[in-house]
Design a protein with these regions (language model features):
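Generic recognition of short, well-ordered alpha-helical segments
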Residues: 21-23, 52, 135-136, 169
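N-terminal helix-turn-helix/winged-helix DNA-binding helices
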Residues: 1-25, 34-36, 44, 56-59
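Short, glycine/serine-rich, charged loops/turns that create anion-binding
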Residues: 4, 15-16, 45, 72, ...
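Bacterial carbohydrate/catabolite-sensing allosteric modules
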Residues: 29-34, 58, 79-86, 91-178
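Residues that form or flank phosphate/diphosphate-binding pockets in enzymes
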Residues: 18, 48, 132
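Short acidic/polar active-site loop segments enriched in Thr and Asp
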Residues: 6, 63, 118-121
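Residues that line or immediately flank small-molecule/substrate-binding pockets and catalytic motifs
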Residues: 12, 69, 125
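Central regulatory/effector-binding core of bacterial HTH transcription factors
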Residues: 29-74
Length: 178
């Protein structure tokens, strides 16, 4: 028998990025309404932080995990026999994924750029190193741009890099390539 902690760990790379800050804010509000508290886990500063947080789940410190980080191999998640919810990455057939309609997002982005007469586009895309629903957005965007004859330069961002220095490097690298 194990007494529930009433705590859900929310794993994100960093709350310095507005997307993750807003996501955590909304997750916390919804979980609070259901009688849970969150333990916020920023993982970008420590190499093995994600694994340590999953270990907390196994040791009954938290009742479940909502994860938006994906530095671990999918096999690590498959070992966990407690509630896990992922967003924007498939972690296994028994782990639910929350994702947006990425194909529609790609279509909308392409339509807006085309409507505004854009002819040469730099397309920053997520890493293809992992299977993720966000690839659908990029494929749809690229498909539409190609059909419309718009020149599109794809720039693949490194996997799991969220710091400002990396983005400065990426922009410099992009201009060196163009």
């Amino acid at each position: 028998y194990h007494k529930k902690s009433g705590i859900i760990a929310v794993l994100v790379p960093t709350v310095e990025i507005p997307f993750f800050a807003e996501l955590v804010h909304n997750i916390e509000a919804e979980l609070y309404n259901e009688g849970f508290k969150i333990m916020l886990c920023n993982t970008d500063k420590a190499h093995n932080a994600e694994l340590e947080y999953l270990d907390m789940l196994n040791r009954h410190i938290v009742d479940g995990v909502i994860t938006g980080v994906h530095s671990l191999d999918v096999e690590e998640y498959k070992k966990i026999k407690k509630p896990i919810v992922a967003f924007d990455r498939y972690l296994g057939e028994n782990i639910p994924v929350v994702a947006v309609d990425h194909k529609e997002g790609g279509r909308l982005a392409a339509e807006i750029l085309l409507k505004n007469g854009c002819k040469k586009i730099v397309h920053f895309r997520g890493s293809t190193a992992v299977e993720s629903p966000y690839h659908e957005r990029h494929f749809e965007f690229a498909r539409i741009m190609k059909e419309q004859g718009v020149e599109c330069f794809d720039y693949e961002l490194a996997w799991n890099k969220f710091d400002l220095e990396y983005y400065k490097y990426a922009v410099k690298d992009l201009f060196d390539r163009l």
